[in-house]
């Protein structure tokens, strides 16, 4: 299903039929599309949107996230995979902190259990970042 273009967030680039490739939730999700586009509250801003459609209407549960927050979530996610509770914190410019030291391993275990789905996405992220920075030189 295509991202709607008649709602307030205006997609510029979109992933249609995301429900078919949604990682461990593929074919079991109400997320129908992802997009990068004009933010719904300020068309001068760019945001990312997760489009949910559980029935015949687009859900108000669809999430719009400012672009910098989407990048920050990616940084935090990857940093959490390599977290060492004995290391000096923070590890990134986000100034993250360990809130539940006893559960850090749970994140690492989750990655290990889902590596077949997550690793290809991380590898693709690495490749696209390499291309991005190569063009900036």
Predicted regions and their residues:
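A short, structured beta-strand/loop element
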Residues: 28-64, 83-102
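Elongated alpha-helical scaffolds
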Residues: 68-79
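Classical N-terminal secretory signal peptides
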Residues: 1, 134-137
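Charged/polar positions within long, soluble alpha-helices
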Residues: 78, 82-89, 130, 134
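N-terminal "first-domain core" detector
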Residues: 1-33
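Charged/polar low-complexity intrinsically disordered segments, enriched in acidic residues
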Residues: 92-135
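Amphipathic, non-membrane alpha-helical segments in soluble helical-bundle scaffolds
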Residues: 63-70, 115, 119
